[in-house]
């Protein structure tokens, strides 16, 4: 399911919260700048921001023909497909729960866990300030809570991401 893979990669690499993901539109993505715009109208911290868009995500978006949709379409409409109608933010969790059940994963693994892991991995690879900025945390202490919760893993120092698309 490539659309769900896209949602997972967005959560992990961009660190955009699920509710915010549900409000993103195709036009919020800049291929030239390799960024995603998060509007203050739906961001948790009520501030406009741009976050980096990993090249693996762009490659998958191109493969899924995301940029053939009108710019005013929501990136994740119903069934995670680009649509003029916004999909409910809970669709990410529902899809995750189905996958988790099939894979027989423990309930401790949540869709939001991808953001936690992304923050930790990015901080270990590029530094806590880069992770703070990508996660749009107002204070580095918030970012440190994510890192301390999971512990620092030396193996992530050569971070190229754990979710790949070839």
Residue ranges and their predicted role:
Residues 1-4, 14, 51, 67-73, ...:
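Short, basic (Lys/Arg/His-rich) helix/loop patches that form interaction surfaces
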Residues 1-18, 44:
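Basic, Lys/Arg- and aromatic-enriched nucleic-acid-binding interface segment
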Residues 11-33:
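Short, charged phosphate-coordinating catalytic segments
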Residues 27-29, 41-43, 66:
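Short polar/acidic secondary-structure junctions
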Residues 36-39, 107-109:
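A short linear hydrophobic-aromatic micro-motif
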Residues 40-42, 46, 135-160:
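Catalytic-site neighborhood detector that most strongly recognizes the C-terminal catalytic loop/helix
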Residues 43-63, 71-98:
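C-terminal catalytic core of Y-nucleophile DNA break-rejoin enzymes
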